[in-house]
Amino acid sequence: VIMEQFEPEQYLALVERYQVTHSQLVPTMFSRMLKLPDEVRHKYDRSTLEIAIHAAAPCPVQVKEQMIDWWGPIIHEYYGATEGLGFTACDSAQWLAHKGSVGKVMIGDLHILDENMQPAPKGTPGEIWFKTATPFEYFNDPDRTQQTRSADGTMSTVGDVGYVDDDG
């Protein structure tokens, strides 16, 4: 089901009407649904919804906690980029054990580097870089491509910041 624009109550009605099993959302959609009155939030049957995936922006811890409380442990999160550098993922249980996490690396070789391109200590934020088999290139824009590559050309970034904890 594709919505022309997101309206929180309409989304819930469509889940019920079409017995949606899987849905892709962004954190803003969660926030908007959580602002609905309780009677509206609980008016629609979501029992067919098995997996709700979210990405595209950081999800505030409080919002995700409230969504898991409301929908149960069906919420999954991933981090990646259109450029295809790498991919991390976590389910509700993994997230609850590490609130704020975007999961463990599933694809790519992750490196968190400081401003000197040195590995950042565990728990210290740094720029997210991935070493991939096929680095991406911006179409007809070699200067921009060069800005997103390590000096040796083996790693790429989109400029996001993150950190790795002791559990990876």
Regions found by a protein language model. Give the residues of each.
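Conserved ATP-binding/catalytic segment of the ANL
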Residues: V105, P121-G123, E127-G168
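Gly/Ser/Thr-rich phosphate-binding loop
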Residues: V1, L12, R17-L25, L34-H98, ...
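Short beta->alpha linker loops
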Residues: F6-E7, T28, P58
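Ser/Thr-centric signal marking residues that sit
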Residues: T21, T28, T82, T145, ...
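Short, P/G- and charge-enriched loop/turn segments at secondary-structure junctions
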Residues: Q94-S101, T148-S150
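Acidic/polar helix N-cap motif
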Residues: E7, D114-N116, D141, T145
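Conserved loop-to-helix N-cap of the C-terminal "lid" that shapes the substrate pocket in Rossmann-like
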Residues: Q5, V20, K99, M155-V158
